Amino acid sequence: MKTDLLIFLALSLPAFTQTTVKDALAKHWKTSGEFTIAVANAMPADGYTFRPNPEEMNYGQLMAHIAGVNLNACSNASGLAKPALPPKIAEWSKDTQKVDVDKDTAVAFLRDSFDFCDKAVAAMTPERLDAVVGPPNRHLTGFEWLWAYFTHTAHHRGQAEVYLRVKGLKPPGYAF
């Protein structure tokens, strides 16, 4: 009897662990989305063309970049098809350094990208989290796609906070 129970627990543990990982990913992607949108909203509309130096993306391009990469990463991780790009974003994606993205478009695109990522994470199975997925030139598990691009979002959100401070604006407080 004890042996059967131990075998059952040993075989069940990976499933419990994966569920916990998935739940943590879902929680933190949601928080990251809300925080990133708050940072996006902190810049006034007329600041969306601001760039601290000529080599940097402007604020609107930076927000669109975060959202576009979210769609790619969450699609690769989950296998869900990416939603169609809004017309202004499709135009921007053809020339990311020359086409500006206004605040309303950028914030809506960010919101849509995080909504898509919420659905993608919810659709993940333990097998998909462990499987190598996505394009052949990127050997990442589903978990790695989500984690790598969670940190990508954090990196660029931090960059956006510097843009705000350079403009004399106070970014929203950290959320975790």
Which ranges hold each PLM region?
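Well-ordered alpha-helical scaffold segments within catalytic/enzyme domains
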Residues: F35, V39-A40, C74, F116, ...
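Boundary of Sec targeting at the N-terminus
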Residues: F16-Q18
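N-terminal signal peptide c-region/cleavage motif recognized by signal peptidases
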Residues: S12-P14
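Membrane-proximal, proline-rich intrinsically disordered regions
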Residues: M43-P44
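Sec-dependent signal peptide recognition
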Residues: M1-F8
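Acidic/histidine-rich alpha-helical segments that form the ligand environment
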Residues: K94-V133, E144-H152
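Short, contiguous alpha-helical
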Residues: A26, K30, E34-I37, G47-W92, ...
